[in-house]
Amino acid sequence: IKTAVEIMNKTGAVNVGGLMFADSKKGLQRTIAQAMRSKLGVGSSKFHTGGSAGESETVYLGTFKKSAVIAAGGFDERYIRAQDWELNHRLRKNGGSIWFDPRLVVTYRPRNTFRKLAKQYFQYGRWRRVITRQHQNTANFRYLAPPIAVLVILLSISFAVLVNPVFITPIFIYFASLIVGSIFIGKKIADKLLMPLVLATMHLSWGVGFITSPKKLFKS
């Protein structure tokens, strides 16, 4: 906290945070941790994958300047997921700066089963859709890639069955890219073998959650 406050005073940022270092030494949980630190798994967000110190869209946890939070409208308790991103968005919209520093590291223990991982990322997707409804023009490729992947897979299967088997090609390309990426992301042989399934679970669960997110999920 002392380091975060020093950075805040030096940079003038209204929120200072660092890296969510997903880590585990146990089986599937270890593989999931590696996926959550990879760009193929979670995109290029600094607080997941690391990077140099500087302004950021959001940070993990964070040390907030109280007056700035109050000026931005406070913490919105209606959000079940993505609360930190939503608050940081309002802070930035209000003229504040969010600062990432890689020296601030918090160890995170990820889910340890496919079922729990799928449920987690399904909820992430659902609430990301809520964010895009409440704050228009905030969706970027990182957030839209999973639902696009789900739609492409569904269309590929439909066209392959109804028109021509060649339309199954995008699915093969998607899973081939996961397999190739897993070779570089996975640390051990077991990780490399499990990684494609872990990545697909993260991507597709998020995508399905985003697509099926009901408007009534957010109580206005």
Q: What do the PLM-derived regions correspond to, one by one?
A:
Residues 1-38, 97, 102-109:
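Conserved donor NDP-sugar-binding/catalytic core segment of glycosyltransferases
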Residues 2-3, 30, 86-90, 127, ...:
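Alpha-helical elements of Rossmann-like donor-binding domains used by nucleotide-donor carbohydrate transfer enzymes
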Residues 15-25, 32-61, 70, 134, ...:
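Short, flexible, basic/aromatic active-site loop/helix in glycosyltransferases
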Residues 48-81, 90, 94, 102-103:
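Conserved nucleotide-sugar donor-binding catalytic segment
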Residues 76-139:
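Catalytic donor/gating beta->alpha subdomain of glycosyltransferases that bind UDP-sugars
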Residues 139-147:
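Select subsegments of transmembrane alpha-helices in polytopic membrane proteins
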Residues 148-219:
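Membrane-embedded multi-pass helical conduit in multi-pass membrane proteins
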